[in-house]
UniProtKB/Swiss-Prot annotation:
Pfam families: E2F_CC-MB (PF16421), E2F_TDP (PF02319). Keywords: Activator, Cell cycle, Coiled coil, Cytoplasm, DNA-binding, Nucleus, Repressor, Transcription, Transcription regulation. Residues 1-69, 114-159 are annotated as: Disordered. Residues 1-11 have a biased composition (Low complexity). It comes from Arabidopsis thaliana (Mouse-ear cress). Its main location: cytoplasm. GO terms for cellular component: cytoplasm; nucleus; transcription regulator complex. It is found in: Cytoplasm; Nucleus. Residues 245-286 form a coiled coil. The lineage of its organism: Eukaryota, Viridiplantae, Streptophyta, Embryophyta, Tracheophyta. Residues 249-277 are annotated as: Leucine-zipper. Residues 12-26 have a biased composition (Pro residues). Belongs to the E2F/DP family. This is Transcription factor E2FA. The C-terminal region (366-485) is required for transactivational activity. The N-terminal region (92-128) is important for nuclear localization.
Length: 485
């Protein structure tokens, strides 16, 4: 269509009807155009909402249409007949009713729905084709705020209440805090679980979950059924001094943390100084300690000190001396094992204490011992000899109730004097053959095992059997086993 005819702002009145002439009389000729009767057509159903009520009809003045006879008017919601005198807008009333019901929907309590309150109702605004989609989008935008029911009482103030509880409100952590606060408010720290469940408005199984955890970490105890007692700070959380004690403990923890940090700094500085000292080639000749340096340490005063030089991974075992049930006397042993290399053992210092015998008299220890005996041992206790049987194992295995200076050859070990310290060297006998009491090798005789000096005369009289030669070593009588194998 070529154009749109607009109505004048003045009042629009219908034109006067044309004069009716009888068919026999001739039609007078006038200067004004003849307006034909209005042809009514059925309007097509429109999918767009109407701009105005369907019962209203707008008609234009003939004067405004005198120069626009061939134009037509198109409206978004109706169909316009191509007339020369008027434009009629029609829209189906059923469509308008359905649309208006959708736009304005009164709620049950007399208020309009919050999702449709912002929809314009002015007839001058044209809704889009996707008007229903816009309504959904606005309703979706308002979904973030909870819709609360509005009271019908107009005089009461409108209050907003949450539609649902938060997840944190029902969490076990928050419930535990509330439960501990109840214990603090309880008298003498005693709380009834039934009353706690009623106060907190939770099930008892939730209370039991909390009490099981607190009882597991030793904060509460159950002296009676369904009653708990606090065992935390000051044994009673209801005291007023509990908060003060907690603050004191926190301050003490901070002070200890500062002291620990200072000690860590000192350790780090000392390690750096030792590293610089050891890595410097000029200081290699000073990298040693003497026996006096070791004995002068405060922790080694009045102690028997045995130094062990062993590779990394060496294990040291000291069995209980009372576990040797097959031996009548207590046995003190030190067992060293290593698979990475040889083990060196030194007797650095020997404690010169008094040893008490069975009669209670004090006597000084022998002048020369294979190794130092345990401090405070009696005459019935064994003085052990530490031997290194092979580069992998060092075992204290020999019993010597009454040691003498000449008995070192009978124990099959060698000792070297190194710079004032006594070094214990490995034995010639292998580890598997060190237990000579149970040795069953037929090639080794008893004479070879108990070898002494070659000048000893074994052919002496029968009467002299009870008196051994003066050069022969003493043998423990309980150690001989004459049972043939």
């Amino acid at each position: 269509m070529s154009g749109v005819v607009r109505s004048s702002p003045g009042s629009s009145q219908p034109p006067p009807p044309p004069p009716h002439h009888p068919p026999s009389s001739p039609v007078p000729v006038t200067s004004t155009p003849v307006i034909p009767p209005i042809r009514r057509h059925l309007a097509f159903a429109s999918t767009k909402p109407p701009f105005h009520p369907s019962d209203d009809y707008h008609r234009f003045n003939p004067s405004s249409l005198s120069n626009n006879n061939d134009r037509s008017f198109v409206h978004g919601c109706g169909v316009v007949d191509r007339e020369e005198d008027a434009v009629v807008v029609r829209s189906p009333s059923r469509k308008r009713k359905a649309t208006m019901d959708m736009v304005v929907a009164p709620s049950n309590n007399g208020f309009t729905s919050s999702g449709f309150t912002n929809i314009p109702s002015s007839p001058c605004q044209t809704p889009r084709k996707g008007g229903r989609v816009n309504i959904k989008s606005k309703a979706k935008g308002n979904k973030s705020t909870p819709q609360t029911p509005i009271s019908t009482n107009a005089g009461s103030p409108i209050t907003l209440t949450p539609s649902g509880s938060c997840r944190y409100d029902s969490s076990l952590g928050l419930l535990t805090k509330k439960f501990v606060n109840l214990i603090k408010q309880a008298k003498d720290g005693m709380l009834d679980l039934n009353k706690a469940a009623e106060t907190l408005e939770v099930q008892k199984r939730r209370i039991y979950d909390i009490t099981n955890v607190l009882e597991g970490i030793d904060l509460i105890e159950k002296p009676f059924k369904n009653r708990i007692l606090w065992k935390g700070v000051d044994a009673c959380p209801g005291d007023e001094d509990a908060d003060v004690s907690v603050l004191q403990l926190q301050a003490e923890i901070e002070n200890l943390a500062l002291e620990e940090q200072a000690l860590d700094n000192q350790i780090r500085q000392t390690e750096e100084r030792l590293r610089d000292l050891s890595e410097n080639e000029k200081n290699q000749k000073w990298l040693f300690v003497t026996e006096e340096d070791i004995k002068s340490l405060p922790g080694f005063q009045n102690q028997t000190l045995i130094a062990v030089k062993a590779p990394h991974g060496t294990t040291l075992e000291v069995p209980d001396p009372d576990e040797a049930a097959d031996h009548p006397q207590r046995r003190y042993r030190i067992i060293l094992r290593s698979t990475m290399g040889p083990i060196d053992v030194y007797l650095v210092s020997e404690f010169e204490g008094k040893f008490e015998d069975t009669n209670g008299s004090g006597a000084a220890p022998p002048a020369c011992l294979p190794i130092a005996s345990s401090s405070g041992s009696t005459g019935h206790h064994d003085i052990e000899a530490l031997t290194v049987d092979n580069p992998e194992t060092a075992i204290v295995s020999h019993d010597h109730p009454h040691p003498q200076p000449g008995d070192t050859s009978d124990l099959n070990y060698l000792q070297e004097q190194v710079g004032g310290m006594l070094k214990i060297t490995p034995s010639d006998v292998e580890n598997d053959e060190s237990d000579y009491w149970l040795l069953s090798n037929a090639e080794i005789s008893m004479t070879d095992i108990w070898k002494t000096d070659s000048g000893i005369d074994w052919d002496y009289g029968i009467a002299d059997v009870s008196t051994p030669p003066p050069g022969m070593g003493e043998i423990a009588p309980t150690a001989v086993d004459s049972t043939p194998r």
